[in-house]
Structure formats: structure tokens, C-alpha cells
């Protein structure tokens, strides 16, 4: 079990594929019902009252489909009608959301010509039509190029100023750039929940860098939790997590969130 307090407005749920993130997101979105236990939002048991949750929820699924023949503005009006947003309120709300999602210049373009990043921003606009208190985004940056991913991260950070944003991803850099608190899942269970800085502190003084020969890299990967390897003319500079210096030439390195994440997933191993 766990609890998200009011000040924790940007929560990243991260874990490898198959960790259980998708199942949890579907429970939160009231798409599926838990077989046991309770799930509360602001004190209300949403298992027994899913409609109450849906009124305050905005959900962006991993596979967000659109009608390619519609323009962005037409599609948002269509979705607003499905969500029961009154006609008089829909137009100004859509105008605001097109600006928020940085789509105002593309409002009259057909969705069939949009890039993947633009489609995801249309998805965010749809999720915000009912002005939700909780925005849930499931793997929203998968398939986006680096520029679109950075733009989408910035959008999520801006949106978290007024609501709780729950981001599920297996891409550590996504949560590193957007989340004020992380919930790490592994094998269907919550392995840790903490601020990114606290997770990084767990591996401080256990991160090392040293240079190995090109033919030694495989052995080093087998022996240590290597999070980065940079090839050069003089060998491979290895960045790894280990309790003790892996080599006489190893020097302490600044830990990263990826170091903390991968170390946590690997569990207590030796010599890692």
C-alpha cells in the first residue's frame, strides 16, 4: 500500500517491462477492478465508486488513437461531447488546451499529418478536457524522437503545477526530468518510493569509473552493474555500481538516478 500526499504533485512510476506498471495504471484509471484490497482518492474508495474517480481523472493511454481525417480542433470538440462537456464551455476550454499543448498553430490541420509527439500532445489535451485533479500518463514518450520527448517532458512539468501528475514509464530519464517523487516497481511489487535525490544518495560512494580493454568489457558486465560504457581509442571507460572499488584504477564517480534504479532492481548481489 501507499499514499500520495498533496505536495507530491509529480509522481513517476518506473520499472522494467512486465513489472506491473500497466496493471496499476489500469486500476487507477478504473478500467479494471482489483481482486482484493482498496484504492482511495481523497478519502473516497473508488473501487466502490468508480464514477466519482472518472470525474476527476484525466487518462492518456500508451496507445492513443485518433481519427486521422479530423482536424485537431474537430477531434477535441468530438471528445468534449463524449465527455459531457457543455457546448458553451467546450470552445473556450479547447482554445486554452490547444495553447497549453502548443498546438494552436496546428488546430486546423488534419491529425493524419501529425507527428507522434503532436499526437501525444493532442492526447494530453483530451485528457485535460474535464480539468482533472489527477492526470495519468502511461508510457507517453515511447516512440518519440529526443526533441519531441524533451518537449513532452516540459509540458508534463508545467501541468503538474495545478494537479497531480502520475507518469508510468520504463525510461529513467523521463522521470528524472519531470518527477518530484518516484515509485519503483519490480516483479509486480513496489520496490521503493522516494524523492529522486534520496534514491541517488543510496548509491553514493558506490559508483566508480575506470578504463578496461575492449576485450574485457564482457567480463566486467558479468561481474558488475555497469550503467554506462564509453568506447575510446585507449579502451572502454566503464561507469558501474559496486560496494567496493572494482579495480585499483577505479575512481569514485558522481551517481545518477539510473545507477540507483538499476542497483535497486539487481538486488543484493556479490560483488555488485
Predicted features by range, described:
Residues 29:
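Helix-to-loop junction immediately C-terminal to a conserved catalytic motif
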Residues 152-239:
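ABC transporter nucleotide-binding domain
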Residues 135-138, 144:
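Catalytic Walker B motif of ABC-type/P-loop ATPase nucleotide-binding domains
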Residues 37-45, 53:
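Conserved ABC transporter NBD signature motif
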Residues 124:
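Hydrophobic anchor residue at the start of the ABC signature
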Residues 77, 81, 88-106:
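Conserved ABC ATPase "signature" region
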